[in-house]
């Protein structure tokens, strides 16, 4: 009853930003990476497909990685990804910034340098075009910061506003990162706090502050460029970014071993833990829970913490694994640079449950 009630409230809302065009958030399950098709459904679909694969493709969708990699020569590869979704914020300019930051992140997560992007636009016929202009302006500003050239795109009429980008970059063949390979003894670190969807849910029904909402926007519009620049100095076992499948969902892709998650180390966005305590969770978070909860042992009762760990992130941080000595140096350097990185946990030998929250 509570879940259905919240879903109905959250998914038919109109927000107005200060001096900005109106965005209509008529969403089935809310916007951003919260809209992703569930882990189980997507895995079931992809396992039955067998697409043609060129020999130059060294990383494809079969690895559930952040982007595909196409080997150009012995030195360098092309890395490419696309992301798009519906609105989840009240300000069109912010929406463009978030969508672009999120799309570019996949290139950083592979160790690459983004070079150019193509816009993906879905926009209702007859809607105020000033809204679209502001979305595109937001994307332009993020791409300018990332030194990414917007070089074209495609637009169609649609019932709902959607925006994203196809981003292309380059990566040296000996510097490609993947989301696999974390080993026993490695430590996981995440570069951004968790709880974005929870804050958005709470804000949409007036249950969290404007300050918390603004902090969530800041989190989603911070490029992973700066964290990636630091990481390139170190030896890493596994790298990905945390988005729609939540922290546990993306951890699940990084190792075949088990992971102890350090509950006391988890960094929450302001207002997210309180939102979870008030049952203001999202449809995407509940999909993640259903797909993954059988793999998780919680050694103490903390429902709100559970929801944060399953919460879908839009434009989340880089999640990486490294040996302890490397992890300590990376964490120190990131903190000195103002990056709010924190320990997530450590890889241990495989146990009955893949994840243990301690």
What feature does the model see in each segment?
Residues 9-30, 41, 125-149, 158-161, ...:
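Glycine-/charge-enriched secondary-structure boundary and capping motifs
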Residues 200-216, 337-340:
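Short, compositionally biased
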Residues 57-59, 67-70, 106-108, 140, ...:
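A generic local secondary-structure boundary/capping motif
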Residues 15-109, 148, 183-188, 193, ...:
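N-terminal glycine-rich phosphate/pyrophosphate-binding loops that anchor nucleotide-derived ligands
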Residues 166-175, 211-231:
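Active-site glycine-rich loop that binds ribose-phosphate moieties when present
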Residues 72-88, 113-208, 346:
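Glycine-rich anion-binding loops of enzyme active sites
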Residues 97-107, 138-142, 146, 223-227:
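Short, well-ordered amphipathic alpha-helical segments that serve as non-catalytic structural scaffolds
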